């Protein structure tokens, strides 16, 4: 489908292009309604026969991926909307919503102060416009060195998505109702949602009651653990990849700075490491928190 979307001929080309056109319309509508437009990259590892990292692949989202994503989002949204309108003898069907609250205003103000150090400003007074304003900023700086750092800080300023029985909507996707429905073989939340939907469509007798609150808390907690485990495993295999390359030179981009040094991410493989302040060559450097820069005492060189 990727090749057909990009203009080549193939089986079901008319159907695939129609699906792609609809997906792009759905995406444009979400963004117009205030959905966050975050570009992500995924690191994949190719292992040799001994289990060591042989090479890295950086996967970036293409139109074919976005096509699948939009229809998954549509299915999740429609299921949540459908069940939310149904009632049982208790007037409300217990359900697992995927919720993403509005960002905390204090965190947004900190983000605003942070980007001012790079010469950028966004309007933060209207909570309903914050996502649009951040999208516009990220679009303007897409090919600048500070893009990845500012996008990372924008994500950190947002609330964390969780599972709840009381729906508050999904801010990041600009949906009033949302759930996780499309992956019951790998997420317990989706399995619960399938059960509730099946019961709603048939008997309207539901096995879940107040215990669904505890289930939501548990799967939210386990999700955070899974994310942390994935992050640590990525770092582990990246370390295995570079451990035998000590002494080689790579192009990199500063991905973060702090009082004790700076973080640098290699451009070709996304491996990241920290350079202690005293080991930055060419000068004696200090951290300027007001300007969010590392500055050389003699040369005035900045990072």
Stretches found by the model and what they are:
Residues 1-303:
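Conserved, carboxylate-rich catalytic/transport cores that coordinate ions
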